[in-house]
Amino acid sequence: MASKHNADLSSAAMLAALLLCALGAPVEYEPTDSPAGDFSGEEQEVTPDLLSASPVWDLIIGVTAHHQKEFEDEFQQEVKYRFLNHYKLSSLPADCPSANFSKEACLQRLAEGLHTYMVLFKHVEKEYPSSSILLHARYHSGALIGLIKEKMRNPGQVTVPTSRQEQQLLQDMDNPSTFHRKMTAHNILRQLHNFLRNGKVAIRKREMPKQKRRKDDGIIPPIHPSYQMT
C-alpha cells in the first residue's frame, strides 16, 4: 500500500494516545512501539461517560477512511474500488441490528467483532507488512475494545477466538493467487471502516435519550471532507 499518508496517520495515533491517557482509558492491545508523531488541530469536546462520544471512534474511522485512496494509488484505476464486492468473507463480523438488540448485546457484538478483526489483521499484515493504516487500525482497535468492555455489565461474556479458530480464519483466507490475497486484505480494511461507522451509530442510538433520538436518527456527521468514502 502507498505510504504517503503516514504523517497524518502518525498524528492521529499520537492524539489517540494523549486523549486515552487524559481519560484514563485502558488499552486492550498495546504494541511494543505504538504509533507516534507530532499532531496539531482543534481540541474536541469530550463526554467521557458516553462511549459514542469517545474521540477514539473518530480517530480510527478517520484512519480507515484513508484506505480507498491508498487502494486507488496502488492500482492506478486498473482495479475499481467497488471490485472488492467480489471478495466477500463469511468470517467478517456482523453489525448490531437496528432494533430488538439491547445495548449490552450490542457492546458485546462490537467487542467480539473487533477481536475477530484483530485476527484478520494478520492476513493484511502478511500481504502488506508496512501498511501504516494497519498499524494504526490495530492500535486504535485495541484501545476501543478496552473502552467497550468498560461500559459492559458483564465484560467477561466477550469471547475471543481460540488458537484453533484463529488458525481456521487465516486458513480460510489463504489462496494461491497473490492478487486474490491482496483483494481479501483490502476488503478487510474496507469492511472494518464500515463496521466502525455502523457500530458508532448503533451505540449512539442506544445511549441517546428517546426524545433526542426522535430528532436525530443517529447519523454521524462527516469527520472531515477528505475522509469521505465514495
From Swiss-Prot:
Residues 206-218 have a biased composition (Basic and acidic residues). It is found in: Secreted. Keywords: Acute phase, Cytokine, Disulfide bond, Glycoprotein, Growth factor, Secreted, Signal. One of its GO terms (biological process) is positive regulation of receptor signaling pathway via STAT. Glycans are attached at residue 100. Residues 206-230 are annotated as: Disordered. InterPro entries: 4_helix_cytokine-like_core, IL-6-like, IL-6/GCSF/MGF. Disulfide bonds join 96-106. Induction: By LPS. GO terms for molecular function: cytokine activity; growth factor activity; interleukin-6 receptor binding. This is Interleukin-6. It comes from Paralichthys olivaceus (Bastard halibut).
